[in-house]
Amino acid sequence: MIDPFKRLARKGLFLFDPETAHGMSIAALKSGLVPACQITPDPRLRQTVAGLTFENPLGMAAGYDKNAEVPEALLRLGFGFTEIGTVTPRPQSGNPRPRIFRLVEDEAVINRLGFNNEGHEAAFERLSALTGKGVVGVNIGANKDSEDRITDYVAGIRCFYSVARYFTANISSPNTPGLRDLQARESLAALLSAVLAARDEMAERSGRKIPVFLKIAPDLTEEGMDDIAAEALAHPLDGLIVSNTTLSREGLKDQRQAKETGGLSGVPLFEKSTAVLARMRKRVGAALPIIGVGGVSSAETALEKIRAGADLVQLYSCMVYEGPGLPGNIVRGLSGLLDREKAGSIRELRDSRLDYWAARKV
């Protein structure tokens, strides 16, 4: 039986340009038109990572709910956590339209949005009004015209400290000129020192230590991975998110849309991002939490991220093609896979294919 959303998406939503369709989906979630997912909690999926308890390992990645409009509605779809943003100190419009492109044959998306968002103040007001206890992370970035990008990240920590369950410092978007330069070792050391000092200062004031993750690109050299791992362990960071979108266009079927500039996400990113994830797990060791992102489209691909070294996983682009039922289907599917593997917890399967993925081509 064909999923009703897929019929609607291909015949309805896909008639609209991607950015308009995205706005319609946010409106539908706000209005309650999208039904909540009914999932029986599975204690085998529950885990504590970076001091936070996650009911299941599946999260909504940053980029969908940029302005913190629907975090609780997303959690009701079955996600174990969600991440708002990327949010910058001041509002900014991002890059000119069109700036999102569907590659339907590839089940992929190319975007060059450029951190379009309403700024810290608007997102903070919405997060302050939340009544639920779900895990909502805040992805922070820098304004395109900022004269001191590190100061922008520090401002994000200070602004959202009372409402964030965790932070993600996004230094890996390819759509803000020069942003990925912050992944270079000297720049990264300065960034992490400043961000973690701000976090520690706020923790001392509030009595709550909020974990900080770093989101990295998949387009890294081996030396680049070495540098990030070394700095993550030296400071120390609370975790990594692997990975953001890629500039690679290798193996795409839709060569017309592939020519668009921007970051590629969706199914074609799975192999590359999972290989980088495994390489980073090898570098940072067993203790540092890692969230795996890129091409998660099913329970099987979510579990494969975990087998490659992830503690948690996130998705976004694949929901464009699979619809709002995807998170619930994945969570239920993970329970079924644990049955098949006769595993007592999802944690038991982490790293079980680490060597395989670490040896794969990046």
From Swiss-Prot:
CDD domains: DHOD_2_like. Binds 1 FMN per subunit. GO terms for cellular component: cytoplasm; plasma membrane. Substrate binds at K66, N111, R112, L113, G114, F115, N170, N175, N244, T245. Its cofactor is FMN. InterPro entries: Aldolase_TIM, DHO_dehydrogenase, Dihydroorotate_DH_2, Dihydroorotate_DH_cat, Dihydroorotate_DH_CS. Catalyzes the conversion of dihydroorotate to orotate with quinone as electron acceptor. Monomer. This is Dihydroorotate dehydrogenase (quinone).
